[in-house]
Structure formats: C-alpha cells, structure tokens
Amino acid sequence: MAEEVPVSNVEEWKPRTKIGQLVKEGKITSIKELYARNMSIAEPEIIDVLLPNMKYEVIDIGMVQKQTDAGELSRYKVLVVMGNYDGYVSIGVGKSKQLRVAIQKAIRDAKMHVIPVRRGCGSWECTCGESHSLPFLVSGKSGSAEVVLRPAPKGTGLVAGGVLKTLLTYAGIKDVWSFSRGETRTTDNFIMAGYRALYNTYKFVTPVDWARRR
C-alpha cells in the first residue's frame, strides 16, 4: 500500500553540497532543471524540496546475517519503491536491527536514486500520442536477470508481474509489455533490472531531441 514519503524540515536543512545550496536558495526550482544541468542528487532533502508529493511502498523484507567476533548478527533488509506516478521513480535499500530504522534508511536511499522516466506512445498499434506507455523498447540487466519493456497500445494495461508491475505503476506507466530472462526469482536483481530499463529511456536520443539541439 502506498504511503506518503516522510519529508524533512527544510527550514532546518543545512546543505552540505553546492547543489543542495542552490536548491535551498531557490536557484534550482524544478527537478527537470536539475537533470537538464546533468546534476546528481547529492542530498535526500533535494527531493523533499523539488518532489514533495512522492509515495513509497515496501516491496520486500528479509533478514541478513553478518558474522562478527561476538557471533552472528542479524539485521532486517528492506527494499522500497518510490515514485510520484508522473514520470519519476526510484528504489532504495536499507538495513538495520530495527525494522522501522531499516525502512527509514531505504526511503533515504531511494531519495538519492530518483530517476526521470521518459513516457510516450511508442506502439505501432496505437496513435493516440499520449504519454501512457514508453516511446520505444528498452531493457535492463542486474546480475543474471534481464527485463525488456516494450510499448503497448492504450488499454493494454501493465503486462508485468509482481514487483515490476509496482515499479511501473509508481513511474506513471499505464500500458506496457514486459519480458524477463535469467534468474528473476531474486527480488533485488529483478527490480533492479526493471529500474535500469526505465533509466535507459533517457539514454536514447530521439528525433525530437535532435531537433531541440539544432
């Protein structure tokens, strides 16, 4: 179930980076401007300011063990998906002995890895021109898992399973066909492969991009 992403007190925020300072001073006012300048998200508070209406969902909770001098130490490992249902999405991982703290760390990690997702109407079966799907076929890999996302006509829905469907929903994609190969039973690799596929939507230069550069 989607929940509101906790937002820090921006008034008390003391930026540690130049980018953070520009955001707090109001010299960067949109997330699009940040990516247009090829700047990275160096502090989670940047997302609190530029994308304040994000939602998140815990998609996996596991236990990890670490061998120490005092014996075996067990911690929670939490995986979350975060997005605004309108072209921005992220995933994050957090570990801690306390579940609540692990979730907080995962949310913070997700804020540092928000990416823009290019949407469009790339299916030859659809000519509506709306941003309901992807503009072209993309793929992503993580470990032995590979995810391929193909544009689908309007009304198809998300032909994807499990956590991948959740990721696409938070990104604001409504229609897509998905294919997967390799070891997809591991949630971490499967969701990361999907995340990298969405990241690749901005790795290709479209005719519109060429026209803008002229």
UniProtKB/Swiss-Prot annotation:
Similarity annotation: Belongs to the universal ribosomal protein uS5 family.
One BP annotation, GO: translation
Pfam families, per database record: Ribosomal_S5 (PF00333), Ribosomal_S5_C (PF03719)
Name of the protein in its database record: Small ribosomal subunit protein uS5
Listed PROSITE patterns: RIBOSOMAL_S5, S5_DSRBD
PANTHER family: 40S RIBOSOMAL PROTEIN S2, RIBOSOMAL S SUBUNIT
Assembly and binders: Part of the 30S ribosomal subunit. Contacts protein S4.
Keywords: Ribonucleoprotein, Ribosomal protein, RNA-binding, rRNA-binding
CC annotations in GO: cytosolic small ribosomal subunit
Free-text comment on this protein's domains from its UniProt entry: The N-terminal domain interacts with the head of the 30S subunit; the C-terminal domain interacts with the body and contacts protein S4. The interaction surface between S4 and S5 is involved in control of translational fidelity.
Residue span, S5 DRBM domain: 54-117
Organism for this UniProt entry: Metallosphaera sedula (strain ATCC 51363 / DSM 5348 / JCM 9185 / NBRC 15509 / TH2)
Annotated GO MF terms: rRNA binding; structural constituent of ribosome
Domain of life: Archaea
Functional description taken from the UniProt entry: With S4 and S12 plays an important role in translational accuracy.
Gene, per the UniProt record: rps5
